[in-house]
């Protein structure tokens, strides 16, 4: 039975990526704006897995927290979206691990320290790996999905 992994970069500027290492297939979407959108996308992945005989997807959710200097309203909105994702994942019965950014980034290797350079590095890394153009907004989610087998301990 083929394994399927879902990488999630939470936040309005993030995304969700599904990855099947068996056939190297990826599918991604910009973070849905609503809880219903999150639920629908993840539930459709489960349905597709059932149709083709894949195992139940394993999720890696980037563990996030508020940042110094972030406004109160934006921090609340960010945390609310993160909690909604946790709820949807639990409601669908998906196995999930939460991983801080440094942990999944370490699986890729040495990266630039500056954020914009690091984002470009990650985008280039996923494009080389996938052989396709990947939008910047979803590059982290794709990278998380690609390193998910390692994070789950499934790469033996």
Where are these regions (language model features)?
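Phosphate- and other anionic-substrate recognition elements at nucleic-acid/protein interfaces
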Residues: 1-156
